[in-house]
UniProtKB/Swiss-Prot annotation:
UniProt-recorded name of the protein: Aryl hydrocarbon receptor
The organism of origin for this protein: Mus musculus molossinus (Japanese house mouse)
Lineage: Eukaryota, Metazoa, Chordata, Craniata, Vertebrata
Motif (Nuclear localization signal 1): 12-15
Described function: Ligand-activated transcription factor that enables cells to adapt to changing conditions by sensing compounds from the environment, diet, microbiome and cellular metabolism, and which plays important roles in development, immunity and cancer. Upon ligand binding, translocates into the nucleus, where it heterodimerizes with ARNT and induces transcription by binding to xenobiotic response elements (XRE). Regulates a variety of biological processes, including angiogenesis, hematopoiesis, drug and lipid metabolism, cell motility and immune modulation.
Spans annotated as DNA-binding: 37-65
Length: 883
C-alpha cells in the first residue's frame, strides 16, 4: 500500500481560463498564420459542441476543452444506450428509430423525472465494469458537493475512500470474485487491466444474485462533512447496451455488466436538511444585481413570478435594509475575485415576508468578459439567521442598518435628507401629503444606488409581520356596530373609577365610540384611509377589536355589578381569625385522649414502687398521729373575694397576693428538659404540646371521693405554722409568662426521668388553664419557719390541695404531713357522679409562695396530679414543694 501523501481524490475540476482581451484588428489586415487559424477553428467547434450539451449555460461556460470532449463522449454513449434499451423488440432496433424519437420528444414535455430525483433521498449512479462513472444524476451535488459534469466519465475510485475501493471492486464483479490480476492501484485509482466476458460466461440479467446492497465512503466537499460521507448503495448488475466497444483485435465486444444503483446517505437526514435540500434555488442577475431569471423553486419560495421579479429594477429592493451594505460588500468581492462567498441576508418574499437565505454568487464570463451573475440561495430558519446576524460586524456603516433605528422608527444618526424612512408625526396625514415633505425623491439618487433602492421599498414591510387583510365591506362593519351597541350603556355606567383602574377600558371605549359613527366616518376613503393603513400594518382587523371589546365588557360588567376585585381583598385578617377560632374550638377531650396512652405503661410500675414504700413505712413507728381530714370549704368561702391575707390549707399556711388575672397565649419557646419523675430510673416520656386558650368554655365534674390516709413519713419537718408568723418570700417577683415559657415543651420532646422524683399514674383528670411563676431554688431559712423547695434536694416534697373559689366542695384532703425523705402517692381510684357544671372563675384566686409560684389549676383527686395547660401532668408533691 502506498503512502497517504500519494493518494489522490477527486476535487473540483479546473475551469475554463479567462481569455485575454481581444486585440483590435490592425489596419493593414490579418496576417496569414496556419496554426492560429487551426486553433481558431478548433475553438469554434468546441464552443458549438459545448452548446449542444444538455447542461445549463452557467455550467457550459466554465468547462474547459477536455471537459467538453469528455462530456460529449459521455452524452453520446448515454444516447446510444437509451436508443437500444427503450426499444421493446429487436426487430424495432433498425426501423423504429424515428418512432422512438417521436415518443422521446413527447416525453420531454413531462418533467416527472426531475421531480422523482428531487423526491429521492439520494442520487442515481451507473458505474461500468471498468469503474467509470457512466451516469450520475444532478442531485449528486446536494450530497457530495460535486456537480454532475465533474464526475461523469471519471474513475469512480477517485470518489471512494481508499479502504473501501477493494470492496467496491468486488461488488462490480458478477461472481463477487474479481480476478487477482485486476488490482486497484490505491495511488491512482483505476484498475490495471479490464476483463471482458462473453454472454456465455455471464448469468442471466434477472438472476437474484445480481442484486447488490453494500456500503462505502465517498468523497464529500460540503461544509457540513468531515471529508467523506458514508453511503448505502442498493441496486443490481445490468447489461449496458449500445456501447459498441471493440477488443484488441478489432472485434465488437458484447454488452458488459454495469452497476445501476441508488446511493443514499447511511445516516437519515434531519428535517432541517430535508427542507434545505428541497428548497435550494438559483437566480440569475446582471452585473448590478438586477434579477433577470429565477428557477421554479425560487418562484415557489419567494412567491413571485419571473415577470414580477425581473421588472422591479435593482435586486437590492428585495434585500433588507439592515443587510444592504453587507451584501454590497460581498458584491464588490465577487466582482474582484469572481465569487462572493457565503453571505447570509434577508430576502423580501411576496406578501411582505422576510426570508433568511444563505447565498453564494459567482461571476460568469462570456468571451473573456463578465457577463452575468448566478446566485445559489439556501433558505435558513429565523434562529440561524439571527445567529449569523450577531456574528456580523457592527461597525459604523452597519449602525444605521441594523434595524433598531430606522426599521422601528427610532431616531437615526443621519440627517433628514438621508433618512429613507422618516418618522411619521401625524397619523391623520395622508401619504401624499407627508411623503414629499420629509422624504427626498427617488430621482435625487442614481437608479442603481442603494439609497434609491431603499426609497423604493414600502415602509410597511419594516413595521410588523404581515397579516391577512380584513374584510372592510359595509355589511361587516354594520354587523360589528350592532353587536357592540348593546353594551355601550353598561360600559358607560361603570364609572370613572373603573376606567382609571383598568387603562385599556378607555381605549376600547374610544374604539367603540368610533365604530358607533358608522363605516363612513371611520373609513371615509376605505382602503386609502390612513387609519386603515395603520391597522393593516399592525395586523389588527375588526375581529380583534371585537374580541377586545367583549373582554372589556365582561370585566367592566362584573365590576359594575358590585363584585369585589380580587386584588383589593386582604385575606390576612380572615386567615388569622379562622386559625384563632380553630384553636379556641378545639375540644379538651383530645388532650385527655392523647395524654392517657403516653403514660399508661408507667402506672403499673408506679403502683409496685408505692406498695414497696408503704411496706417499708409500716415497719417504722409513726412519728405523730395523723390529723383528720378537713374540708376545703372551711378555709375558703366561695362567696368572698380573697384579700391579701394568709390562708390555711390542710394545716399549711401560704401567702396569697391578689393580682388581676392575665390571659395569654402560649408562645413557642426553646426546648427545655424537666425531670418530673425522679422515682423511676432510666425511663423517658414524651409530652406533646398543643397551645390552648384560657378563655375556652368547658365543664368539670365534681364528685366526692374517698381518699385513704397518706402513709407516715419522717418527723423532721412540720408544716403547720400560724398564718400571722408566715414570712413572705425574699425571692424577686417574676412575670406571669416566665412559668408559661417553662411549661411549654414542643410535641414529641423526650424528657429524662429523674429517679429522685415521685412517679404518678395518669387517671381521669380535669382540664383547666393554669399560669404560675417559675419555681426557683433558694436557701432554706429554718426548719421551723418554712420548708423551701429545692430542685437539687432529692425527695423534697409537700402536697398541694385542690382549690376551688366558687361552688360546692365535696372533695376532702388529708392533713397528713409529708416527709422530706420520701415521696408517696396514693393509689386510690376516683368514684365520680356524673354531674357536669360550668367551671367557676377561679382567676381571682392568686397567691404567692416561697418559690413565687402563682397558678390556676385543678388537681386530680385520686393520683394527686395537676393538669397544667391541658398538656402537662405534674406530681402532687412537685406542686406541694412550691407552696
Amino acid at each position: 500500500m502506498s503512502s497517504g501523501a500519494n493518494i489522490t481524490y477527486a476535487s473540483r475540476k479546473r475551469r475554463k481560463p479567462v481569455q485575454k482581451t481581444v486585440k483590435p484588428i490592425p489596419a493593414e489586415g490579418i496576417k496569414s498564420n496556419p496554426s492560429k487559424r487551426h486553433r481558431d477553428r478548433l475553438n469554434t467547434e468546441l464552443d458549438r459542441l459545448a452548446s449542444l450539451l444538455p447542461f445549463p449555460q452557467d455550467v457550459i461556460n466554465k468547462l474547459d476543452k477536455l471537459s467538453v470532449l469528455r462530456l460529449s463522449v459521455s452524452y453520446l454513449r448515454a444516447k446510444s444506450f437509451f436508443d437500444v434499451a427503450l426499444k421493446s423488440t429487436p426487430a424495432d432496433r433498425n426501423g423504429g428509430q424515428d418512432q422512438c424519437r417521436a415518443q422521446i420528444r413527447d416525453w420531454q414535455d413531462l418533467q416527472e423525472g426531475e421531480f422523482l430525483l428531487q423526491a429521492l433521498n439520494g442520487f442515481v449512479l451507473v458505474v461500468t465494469a471498468d469503474a467509470l462513472v457512466f451516469y450520475a444524476s444532478s442531485t449528486i451535488q446536494d450530497y457530495l458537493g460535486f456537480q454532475q459534469s465533474d464526475v461523469i466519465h471519471q474513475s469512480v475510485y477517485e470518489l471512494i475512500h481508499t479502504e473501501d475501493r477493494a470492496e467496491f471492486q468486488r461488488q462490480l464483479h458478477w461472481a463477487l470474485n474479481p480476478d487477482s490480476a485486476q488490482g486497484v492501484d490505491e495511488a491512482h485509482g483505476p484498475p490495471q487491466a479490464a476483463v471482458y466476458y462473453t454472454p456465455d460466461q455471464l448469468p442471466p440479467e434477472n438472476a437474484s444474485f445480481m442484486e447488490r446492497c453494500f456500503r462505502c465512503r465517498l468523497r464529500c466537499l460540503l461544509d457540513n462533512s468531515s471529508g467523506f460521507l458514508a453511503m448505502n448503495f442498493q441496486g443490481r448488475l445490468k447489461y449496458l447496451h449500445g456501447q459498441n466497444k471493440k477488443g484488441k483485435d478489432g472485434a465488437l465486444l458484447p454488452p458488459q455488466l454495469a452497476l445501476f444503483a441508488i446511493a443514499t446517505p447511511l445516516q437519515p437526514p434531519s428535517i432541517l436538511e430535508i427542507r434545505t435540500k428541497n428548497f435550494i434555488f438559483r437566480t440569475k442577475h446582471k452585473l448590478d444585481f438586477t434579477p433577470i431569471g429565477c428557477d421554479a423553486k425560487g418562484q415557489l419560495i419567494l412567491g413571485y413570478t419571473e415577470v414580477e421579479l425581473c421588472t422591479r429594477g435593482s435586486g437590492y429592493q428585495f434585500i433588507h435594509a439592515a443587510d444592504m451594505l453587507h451584501c454590497a460588500e460581498s458584491h464588490i468581492r465577487m466582482i474582484k475575485t469572481g465569487e462572493s462567498g457565503m453571505t447570509v441576508f434577508r430576502l423580501l418574499a411576496k406578501h411582505s415576508r422576510w426570508r433568511w437565505v444563505q447565498s453564494n454568487a459567482r461571476l460568469i464570463y462570456r468571451n473573456g468578459r463578465p457577463d452575468y451573475i448566478i446566485a445559489t440561495q439556501r433558505p435558513l430558519t429565523d434562529e440561524e439567521g439571527r445567529e449569523h446576524l450577531q456574528k456580523r460586524s457592527t461597525s459604523l456603516p452597519f449602525m444605521f442598518a441594523t434595524g433598531e433605528a430606522v426599521l422601528y422608527e427610532i431616531s437615526s444618526p443621519f440627517s433628514p435628507i438621508m433618512d429613507p424612512l422618516p418618522i411619521r408625526t401625524k397619523s391623520n396625514t395622508s401619504r401624499k401629503d407627508w411623503a414629499p415633505q420629509s422624504t427626498p425623491s427617488k430621482d435625487s439618487f442614481h437608479p442603481s444606488s442603494l439609497m434609491s433602492a431603499l426609497i423604493q421599498q414600502d415602509e410597511s414591510i419594516y413595521l410588523c409581520p404581515p397579516s391577512s387583510p380584513a374584510p372592510l365591506d359595509s355589511h361587516f362593519l354594520m354587523g360589528s356596530v350592532s353587536k357592540c351597541g348593546s353594551w355601550q350603556d353598561s360600559f358607560a355606567a361603570a364609572g370613572s373609577e373603573a376606567a382609571l383602574k383598568h387603562e385599556q377600558i378607555g381605549h376600547a371605549q374610544d374604539v367603540n365610540l368610533a365604530l358607533s359613527g358608522g363605516p363612513s366616518e371611520l373609513f371615509p376613503d376605505n382602503k386609502n384611509n390612513d387609519l386603515y393603513n395603520i391597522m393593516r400594518n399592525l395586523g389588527i382587523d375588526f375581529e380583534d377589536i371585537r374580541s377586545m371589546q367583549n373582554e372589556e365588557f365582561f370585566r367592566t360588567d362584573s365590576t359594575a355589578a358590585g363584585e369585589v376585585d380580587f386584588k383589593d381583598i386582604d385575606i390576612t385578617d380572615e386567615i388569622l381569625t379562622y386559625v384563632q377560632d380553630s384553636l379556641n374550638n378545639s375540644t379538651l377531650m383530645n388532650s385527655a385522649c392523647q395524654q392517657q396512652p403516653v403514660t399508661q405503661h408507667l402506672s403499673c410500675m408506679l403502683q409496685e414502687r408505692l406498695q414497696l414504700e408503704q411496706q417499708q413505712q409500716l415497719q417504722q413507728p409513726p412519728p405523730q398521729a395523723l390529723e383528720p381530714q378537713q374540708q376545703l370549704c372551711q378555709m375558703v368561702c366561695p362567696q368572698q373575694d380573697l384579700g391579701p391575707k394568709h390562708t390555711q390549707i390542710n394545716g399549711t399556711f401560704a401567702s396569697w397576693n391578689p393580682t388581676p388575672p392575665v390571659s395569654f397565649n402560649c408562645p413557642q419557646q426553646e426546648l427545655k428538659h424537666y425531670q418530673l419523675f425522679s422515682s423511676l430510673q432510666g425511663t423517658a416520656q414524651e409530652f406533646p404540646y398543643k397551645p390552648e386558650v384560657d378563655s375556652v368554655p368547658y365543664t368539670q365534674n365534681f364528685a366526692p371521693c374517698n381518699q385513704p390516709l397518706l402513709p407516715e413519713h419522717s418527723k423532721s419537718v412540720q408544716l403547720d405554722f400560724p398564718g400571722r408568723d408566715f414570712e413572705p418570700s425574699l425571692h424577686p417577683t417574676t412575670s406571669n409568662l416566665d412559668f408559661v415559657s417553662c411549661l411549654q415543651v414542643p410535641e414529641n420532646q423526650s424528657h429524662g426521668i429523674n429517679s429522685q422524683s415521685a412517679m404518678v399514674s395518669p387517671q381521669a383528670y380535669y382540664a383547666g388553664a393554669m399560669s404560675m411563676y417559675q419555681c426557683q431554688p433558694g436557701p432554706q431559712r429554718t426548719p421551723v419557719d418554712q420548708t423551701q423547695y429545692s430542685s437539687e434536694i432529692p425527695g423534697s416534697q409537700a402536697f398541694l390541695s385542690k382549690v376551688q373559689s366558687r361552688g360546692v366542695f365535696n372533695e376532702t384532703y388529708s392533713s397528713d404531713l409529708s416527709s422530706i425523705d420520701h415521696a408517696v402517692q396514693t393509689t386510690g381510684h376516683l368514684h365520680h357522679l356524673a354531674e357536669a357544671r360550668p367551671l367557676p372563675d377561679i382567676s381571682h384566686l392568686v397567691g404567692s409562695c416561697s418559690s413565687h409560684a402563682r397558678m390556676k389549676f385543678i388537681q386530680e383527686q385520686d393520683t394527686g396530679t395537676v393538669r397544667v395547660g391541658h398538656q402537662y401532668t405534674f406530681s402532687k408533691t412537685d406542686f406541694d414543694s412550691c407552696i
